[in-house]
Structure formats: structure tokens, C-alpha cells
Amino acid sequence: GNAADLLLLPEAYLTGYELPISNEEALSDDNPYLKQICNAARELQLGVVVTAFTKGVERPQNSAYVIGKNGELLMKYSKVHTCDFADEACLESGSTFRVCDFAGIKIGIMICYDREYPESARILMLQGAEIILVPNDCGSMKPRLCALSTRAYENMVGVAMANPNGENAGSSCAFSPICWDNNGICVDNTLLMADDMSEGLFYADFDLSAIRKYRESEMLGNTYRKVKAYEPLLFGKITYPFLRENQSPID
């Protein structure tokens, strides 16, 4: 074997990315598929991040489950930034970002469109995340790969993304936060970069000891932020040119 600790699967893995879907059709947290994956995780001593459209309060949610090596459910996270400009307008957004402890490592989740907003990774970093995992299902990946590398750099967290293969898609990847060596010389922080068409299992190795040492000494993450200047980030008003037909200016 390859001695993997955790398997990251793409977005909506158990249900398929087929929308619209009703709350009745969405999976409950005690669905048999999740139980089977928990049993397999325990048998293989392998953590798993698996995804599905799940039952929400009124509408389905786009969710990820983090399963520990002993088959225990460590965390459920529901996508905050649903794609309200597309088919996901039928979904219910999650309300909070979450971090869990996986074998002594703090893990956070962003699902697909969450990664388009730097606030997602920033909040996970503030909550203690050391590694951010990104179940994904979309194309036009080139600028998004650059963004994921930047999220790793600016928050001093490892980032890994799993995306279904296909033309202009795929590109499952992983990035280290370590972007320069002890002498200040820039290093390539890319740990994994798959092509768009290859299908299979891809492996990335995060050196947690090196990452933790780096985080203790460098000046990014939550070191010298000037939070008093960030108040506009909390303003909900949407104005031109960002206001869309299905939005209210006070959303």
C-alpha cells in the first residue's frame, strides 16, 4: 500500500452532482452508504472525506463528512457559498465554517465555490486549521489552482483539492504553505498537480513537522493583521457592478 492517512473525494460523491434535488431525495446522516464508508474506513484504518447532497432544514445542503481512521464521524460541514447563480440556487447554504481534529491534525473543509472567497480559508485558519481539504466539481481550473496556492501561502496552511477528471477540469492538486526556504529563497510549493484527463488516485505528502515549524516563525496567517480596518468585510449590501437579478441589495 501507499500508507495514505486520508482519502479526499470530489464534491457530491455519494449522490452525484444532479440538480435540482428535493429535501426528501437528499441523504440523511444515517444513510446506509455513509455507514458502509465508515465501516471501510475502520477496516482499512483510513480517514475519508466524502460528500453528498444532504437533508437541510427546509432544502438540501451540499455537505462533506470527515470520517476518522476508526470509522467515527468527526465532522459534517455544509457548503456556505452555494452557487446561487446556477443550479445550486435550489440548495440551502451552510451557516458556519468548521474545523475538526483528525489524528492530531486540525482539518478544515471548503467545498468548491467556497474557495472563490478568501474569507473561507481565512476563517478556517483562524479556527486553527492546519490543512484545508477541498472537494470540488468544476472546470476552468487554471486561475482556481493559482488561488488555492495563494490560500495556502497567505494562511500558512496546507491545501488539497480533489476534482473529477475531464477536459478543462480535473487538475486535482495539493499545495504546501512553505514558499521559501531558511535562506529566503523561493521554492515551489506544489506537492501535487494532476492533469485534467487522468483518472485515478493521486497522492500528496504534507510534512506537518516542517509546516508547524514554518508557521511558528513566518509573518503570514494571523500574525500582523490589522483587523480594525476590515469592517467593510462585514457589510452585506451588494451594489453595482456585483448585483445580480436574483439578489437583493441588502442580502
What kind of region is each of these model predictions?
Residues K55-Q127, N136, S140-T150, E154-V157, ...:
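Active-site catalytic loop in hydrolytic enzyme cores
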Residues G1-K76, R122, C138-N155:
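Cys-nucleophile CN-hydrolase/nitrilase-fold catalytic domain and related Cys-dependent amidase chemistry
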Residues Y13, N70, E116, M197, ...:
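A generic "binding-loop/recognition-motif" signal
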Residues V99, P164-D251:
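C-terminal beta-strand edge segments of enzyme domains
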Residues L14, C83, S209-A210:
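Active-site/binding-pocket entry motifs
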